[in-house]
Structures are given as C-alpha cells and as structure tokens.
Amino acid sequence: MDPLAKAEIGATGLNVTRLGLGGAPFGGLSEDVAQQRATESIAAGVDVGIRYFDTAPLYGSGKSERYFASALKGVERDSYVLSTKVGRLLNPTADAQTDDVYLNLPPMDVVFDFSRDGIMRSIEDSLKRLELDRIDIVFVHDPDDHHDQVVKEAFPALAELR
C-alpha cells in the first residue's frame, strides 16, 4: 500500500492521503514541542506528500492549531484536507494551566461544551487559530459522557454547517 496514495472518505468528495499527520504531539503531548520544531515537522510532511492533517483545540490548548496555521501558510489550500474537533472551548485565564497529559500550556480554561452555541463558537475560534476560511472535517471530541447533548445539539449544529 502506498501511504501517499489518495483515498476518498466515504462519499464526501474529500480525498486524503492514506497517511495523515496528527497534531496532538505539537500541542505538547508528553513532551513540550517548540513552534519551530512543530512547523518544521509539518513542513516536512508537506514536502513528502502528506495531504491530510488533524488537530484539535484540546491539543495544547490551541497550540497545535496555531502551529498548523504557521506551517501551512503558503501551501495551496485546496491541496490538503484539514480536520479539527469540537466539544471543548478555550477561555483565556490569568492563571497558568497544568495538565497531566499536555506540557507547557498557555493560560486557558478548557471547558466541555457540546451545545449548539458551543459548537459554533468552537469552529469560529478554530478558524481564527488556524487562520483559515474553512475546515474540511469536524469531529466531535470525546462525546462519551455527553451523549444526549451531542445527539440533540452538537450533531444538528454540525449538520447545519454542511
């Protein structure tokens, strides 16, 4: 199997490379990653032909999304597919944040929010951090303990945005 061959995701019309690049490590998952190292890694992925990138607000409280914004500047927007996630809102705070999973976090309170307004705000905030005018795929992040609200509010909100 060629990891750089493209495959369509269902009947969406979106074609992604079989190998994608996930952004959790760039948010400081288990190890702090400097922006230069993250952007160089993403650029190396682009250089070898990777055209599917996944990130989330949760990954480093927005750091991963900002690093993708920096690394993908100048890359033809229609040449890649980018996914992010909803379900967490990032609210600035004066206090430094600590986390058992992500290191060196910016001062943000991370709040679960699967409401319609929360979904819309999450997408708008991600677009700003990513410096993009569109997100190709939006996943609901960790819906397990919020099943009813996800079904009643998050999914209908995402369906509106199709």
Indicate where each model-derived feature is located.
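N-terminal binding-site loop/beta-alpha segment at the start of enzyme catalytic domains
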Residues: 1-92
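Glycine/proline-rich, positively charged
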Residues: 30, 98-162
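Short acidic, glycine/serine/threonine-rich loops at helix termini
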Residues: 94-96
